[in-house]
Amino acid sequence: MPQAIHISPIDNVVVALHPIAKGTLVEVDGLAVTALEDIPQGHKMAVKPIKNGENVIKYGFPIGHATADAQPGTWMHTHNVHTNLSGEVEYSYNPAPDLAPLPKVEPETFMGFRRKDGRAAIRNEIWIIPTVGCVNDIAKKIVADNQDLVTGSIEGLYTFTHPFGCSQTGHDHAQTRKLLAALVRHPNAAAVLVLSLGCENLTHEQFLTELGDYDHDRVKFLTCQDVEDEFAAARDILKELAAYAGQFQREPIPVSDLVVGMKCGGSDGLSGITANPTIGRFSDMMGQRGGSTVLTEVPEMFGAEGFLMDRCINKDVFVKAEHMINGFKEYFISHNEVVYDNPSPGNKAGGITTLEDKSCGCVQKGGTAPIMDVIGYGDPVVTKGLNMLYGPGNDLVSATAMTAAGAHLILFSTGRGTPFSAPAPTLKISTNTPLAEKKSGWIDFNTGVIADGEKSIDEAAKDLLDLVIRVASGEQTKAEKHGFREISIFKDGVVL
């Protein structure tokens, strides 16, 4: 079993695949270095002399600079490494020399639902979308009181509560409206009840304008202040929606119709070595099959965005990517925050030292395929292949944004573990075997087998594709079995 991995030949550090005790001789890629101190799993050890101020190289890329001289065998982490990041950057388009669509492969099929507008779905659920936080508890009670309607091909009745829809202004208010309307359009929702109070800022008329054309059999509205008994009224509407949703049955659908979100959270030092490269290989496989994948977490691209921007399929897509990256940096700066105020305490405990370190691991989820489009918050995926989506690193907010973009399911890699799920089925992928064994009630797929030397990234990616097809065909994720699903809306404005 290998002790460490030397990711790039030019790296001056290796990453411990397992804990390395002080005094252990570590041999990797022709290098032989004795650990001068204990090196925890996922953490970095110098394999070459690194001078004070010299860049620390991992993934073949600077992830910060040393703040003290370090000899081979030294533990390299937050105590002796600091970020190189600052503010906005002027980028230039330098397309990768091998930039071209990957060779096509005949897509497999899954057993999904075909909606009347032609879109594919992997779940056949009824959703209740509150337009304002004031009706959250009403929505929850409606769900609890009407579970008897979940019969036949209907797979669930759910609501997604939130605190917004009122006391917001301007862009913030518009973002909430746009996000909620996008959820109403999601294909996994066979039918939707939009539930409002009646006096909120997000008016019925505004919501209708945002929603645009819709199927009146699929989407119904209820304003609680307009009826005497909102529970009886909701029951009547849900009976109609259940009759509509119950018409759909699973049928063979090509994988090319799938949209898959890609996310990481609770990352550790193995995220960029096991789980994220596996997801990246999966993303390439999806692109070859004519499917779509979505990459977000813009702040966790900072410091590694060049890897992605050079893969934009053309100059127009590059310009959109540039505006997205610098726009998010401006968002930080406008709030008097530094762009490198990341990683989290859990990330650091797992071996991630700087934002560049985290970002270089994060972007591994994007694989090697060209970036075909860059889309805004609340906008749908319309282009096949790899898409970049405007959204923050926050797990709940970014996973909600990917769901709103049309992701049928989300691949979520984690080195520390997390139980949450978006409205779209959320597959948890562990970076290490101890986590998969400890939190078997959370983890759906273990890429720790790569660090253990049991499987290659290619083999793990093929296994992951097989699992995605099974989940798309109805197999429940661990989070679904627990009943976990929620949303969080991106907010950046004042509260009235």
Place the predicted regions along the sequence by residue.
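Metallocofactor- and cofactor-centric catalytic cores in central/energy metabolism, strongly enriched
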Residues: M1-L409, R416-L496
